[in-house]
Each structure stands twice: as C-alpha cells, then as structure tokens.
Amino acid sequence: MKTEMLYLSAPELLHAEARIVAISDRDDGAVAVAKGGGQPADSGWFELPDGRHIDVRNVIRDGEGIVWHVVDGLDPDVHVGAIVEAKVNRPSRYYNSQLHSAGEAVAAAVHFAGYAHWSVQTACHFPGQCRVVFNDHGTTKDLEVVATAIARQLEEMVQDDFPIRLAYAEDLDELNAVHRLEEGKHFAEWPVRLVSPKDGLS
C-alpha cells in the first residue's frame, strides 16, 4: 500500500495519527518528509499511547511509494495494527524547508535576472552543502557579471518580500497548464509540488 504523503497537502502538519501496517518500521501515512528532491529527511519520533517515544533515525521512500521510518529497535507494544502518533522535529523541518526555499529563490532570481534560458541540472539543500547547478547552454561570457546580476536580483527579491505560490499538479496536462516545462522533462510520481513566484514564470 502506497504511503499518503501528508506533508505535500499540508506542509504545516507536524504530527498525525498513523497505523502500523507491518513490523518493518513503516506506517500508512507520513507527515515526515522522506529524503529526496535534494532535501534531507525529517527527524522525529513515534509517540505511543502511554506517552513513550521511539526515535525515528531516518525516513526513506522506496520505489513503490512506501515511506519507511527507520528506528532503533521496536517496542513490544508496536505491532501490526497499533496506532502511534507520528511527530516531526519542528526546528529541523523548518530549517530544511528554508534551505529548500532558498534554492527555489535562487532559481527564480536567475530567471528574473535575464537568464530564463538556463536550466537547473541539479540542486542540493542539505545543510553545509547547499547549491543549485545550472546549464547555461554555452551562452555565458563573463561569470562575474552574471553572478553580480543574480545576486542583485536575489537581494531585491528578499528586500521586497517576494511572494511565492505553492501548487500541486495531479497529471501532466495540469502541470503544463501552470508551469513551463523543459523538453523531455518527466516525473516518476504524482502529485508534483510546484513552487514559483506568485505571478508565475513566463
């Protein structure tokens, strides 16, 4: 059974009741963000009905869409059918989200600084390793001029408290209606979360 990604529809949700579906450290609904999309996994814990905690060391999503919560051993009270409260470490979640949003802001700044033809090749939002790598398609002559223009654009966006919008697309038609895609771009699973400037990218 595919795990429902509760954090996609309600990113502010930091806890939810979950039912253990197998003694393999996975449940049927995940508020924890799994490692992926250039962002580290959430940290958190399962709270048992009697108030005891089981720390979650890692969160992994497998190829079948099942989210696995990796824990250090299982409590005897954790069994198939048991109900636990899955809780996310708030400071860690928001720090990782801020780093991810910063990467999105850099991509928007590149676009608005006049480099809309650049494409993102990869992005990493891990603490201490944050970066967005672009392909300029061989058009850049002076990197210092480009870096200055992008930095200036980013500063303006921050000073103006640049608004963003968050949307979800359930299929390719819906995605193309709200977002310009690169040729050949594809997604392994749906829904796709879109983060863009409030007025969109042309």
Give the residues covered by each predicted segment.
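A glycine- and charged-residue-rich anion-binding loop/surface
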Residues: M1-S202
